Amino acid sequence: MKKFDISVLSVAPLRQGETMKQGIDSAVSLAKAVDNMGYKRIWFAEHHNHDAYASAATVSIVQHILANTKDIRVGSGGIMLPNHSPLIVAEQFGTLETLYPNRVDLALGRAPGTDQKTADVIRRSNHNGVFFFEREVNDILRFVGDKSVQGEVRAYPGIGTHVPVFVLGSSTDSAEIAAKLGLPYAFGAQFSPHSMEEALSIYRENFQPSSYLQEPYVIACINVIAAESIDEASFISASHLQVYIDIYTNNLSKLIPPTENFLESLSQFELEILHSRLGYTIMGDRETIRRELIDFQQMYHADELIVLSNIYELSKEIQSYEILKQVVDELFKKRMEQL
């Protein structure tokens, strides 16, 4: 098993009873904690028209997290490009890179990050933006590239910042685009596990080396709930599981406290949702996490794992990330001792 990095994905979720400000404060606390633990990056996802998330203005959240952390890379996971002008995105992230050099990531996605009615309000007349994703990614690459590749319209700040750009996806289409452009590819297996194997194969087999990247670079996003015991992990995972049920029953709400015997309380339909959508979810104690990480990596060989953990108590969420980091560090410590 090759060495891999680990990172964090967040939507700046609100717990039951929290205000938006409290949700953002919790996101800052999490970011500070994983920064101190040595995680590589933390990304924030763009979602709209949900009172359960505080990450709609993703650029503002990224800037706030950058200002409150020291070493960890911070970025979008991602900016939903059809909702935005490529020039404005380049200017925004060029500004962030100017203020926080070598700490900013720009991951780009094609989805709306919301329901269709909200997407209509955001995009107005730009309903075909999803079909121009590849072209608009290229536009951003140019805007943050060298002066020699610029056209008449330029991004200030932006030119020469070379903000690292990633392609997000949960389908084979996004894999093809990432491969063609020679960019790192982040696959959303946390909610769309079924096409990951095919998408990663397409990306790796069709990857074209570029000035940005010489070899394929795969980031796999998975769910991880870690605790000191299997029983505790099972208990605190109830909040995370409820999120996915809410998403796919169109009933999204704030994170709720976990309850005993959660799975036994679910309907057959709700159990089927979890079975179909949570294929890449690792829950358990240290040994379970270690074993399932090894199994996952032996199958997919990701260069990096970016982890989502929806846990009601912030202290338990931070502990989950701490356990995960310790497990991964121990894996590679033993690996080095065996060489």
From Swiss-Prot:
Which InterPro entries does the record associate with it? Answer: Bact_Lucif_Oxidored, CmoO-like, Luciferase-like_dom, Luciferase-like_sf
Fetch the Pfam families from UniProt: Bac_luciferase
| Cellular component, GO, one term | cytosol
Q: Name one GO molecular function term.
A: oxidoreductase activity, acting on paired donors, with incorporation or reduction of molecular oxygen
- Give the domain of life: Bacteria
What's the family?
A: To bacterial alkanal monooxygenase alpha and beta chains.
Q: How is this protein named in the record?
A: Uncharacterized protein YddN
Q: Which organism is it from?
A: Bacillus subtilis (strain 168)
Gene name tied to this protein: yddN
